[in-house]
């Protein structure tokens, strides 16, 4: 089914409450169906290309007539090379660009929390739009906070990025796998220039702090956060919202910088005006959620780098 914001009444409702609903069309597959799509892609390609799994690439060398892709046990030569390492390969991509002197510029990192609440709170939005991409500009700092990756009747999950445990969310097409909760991320984008340029390093440091304090992901009731107290196992157990992820109860104010947390709290109160119940005491906040972005690599309109035949594509570019 295709969901769209075209002609929706919620655009006006959001604007009336200082929120902005972005235009978007969504065709939902679900995590369970996504596996089938990937299996079909593999089946389509397996007789046409060679796959090498569990084969880390150490470096890429520029040759006179092409490139060498160097792995631990062997090297592959080619006339043209396409690099597509995704967000998880951000550090690797940065190192390769430095070694090959390919120009890059610093990008951003998105930091925030994953919100979990009863599915009924957002059902009027999710039933029509499925995913609401809503942006809010904070009154205090003028920062933009946005909703991201909304999962109606979904589950909150751990995500391992470069050995750091962060939080994410899934949703399913199969009703048997669905839950009574909806979850979504609230993210604040941070950009850096001079003298500090390591946006990803900044995000990693905050995520590592969460791991250090909670042994992984931390969960906190919204009511506890605004009252300046940590959540305890007893308070989580007595909450009217049953968490779908077994996270460590704690205090997110000891992890996230004040400016980011202030913006997230502002956004929750703003969302409460279009989805009453968002700012309930028992709304759960999991932290931290981080979206890493690669250094922006200098490529032309064909996604080719300064080297003829070396292309850098996807989230890795």
Where are these regions (language model features)?
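Residues forming the flavin
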Residues: 1-317
């Amino acid at each position: 089914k295709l969901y769209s914001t075209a002609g929706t009444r919620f655009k006006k409702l959001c604007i009336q409450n200082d929120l902005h609903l972005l235009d978007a069309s969504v065709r939902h597959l679900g995590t369970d169906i996504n596996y089938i799509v990937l299996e079909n892609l593999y089946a389509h390609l397996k007789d046409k290309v060679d796959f090498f799994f569990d084969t880390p690439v150490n470096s890429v060398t520029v040759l006179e007539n092409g490139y060498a892709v160097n792995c631990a046990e062997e090297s592959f030569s080619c006339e043209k090379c396409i690099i597509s390492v995704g967000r998880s390969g951000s550090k690797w991509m940065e190192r390769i660009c430095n070694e090959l002197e390919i120009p890059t510029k610093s990008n951003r990192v998105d930091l925030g929390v994953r919100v979990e609440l009863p599915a009924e709170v957002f059902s009027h939005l999710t039933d029509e739009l499925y995913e609401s991409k809503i942006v809010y500009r904070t009154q205090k700092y003028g920062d933009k906070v946005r909703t991201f990756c909304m999962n109606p009747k979904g589950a909150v999950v751990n995500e391992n990025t470069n050995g750091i445990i962060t939080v994410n969310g899934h949703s399913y097409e199969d009703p048997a796998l669905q839950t009574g909760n909806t979850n979504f991320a609230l993210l604040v984008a941070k950009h850096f220039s001079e003298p500090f340029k390591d946006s990803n390093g900044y995000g990693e440091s905050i995520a590592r702090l969460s791991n250090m304090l909670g042994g992984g992901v931390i969960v906190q009731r919204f009511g506890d956060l605004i009252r300046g107290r940590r959540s305890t196992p007893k308070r989580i157990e007595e909450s009217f919202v049953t968490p779908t992820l077994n996270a460590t109860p704690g205090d997110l104010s000891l992890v996230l910088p004040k400016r980011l947390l202030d913006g997230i709290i502002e956004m929750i109160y703003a969302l409460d005006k279009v989805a009453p119940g968002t700012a309930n005491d028992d709304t759960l906040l999991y932290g931290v959620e981080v979206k890493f972005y690669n250094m922006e690599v200098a490529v032309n309109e064909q996604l080719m780098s300064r080297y003829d035949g070396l292309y850098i594509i996807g989230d890795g570019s």
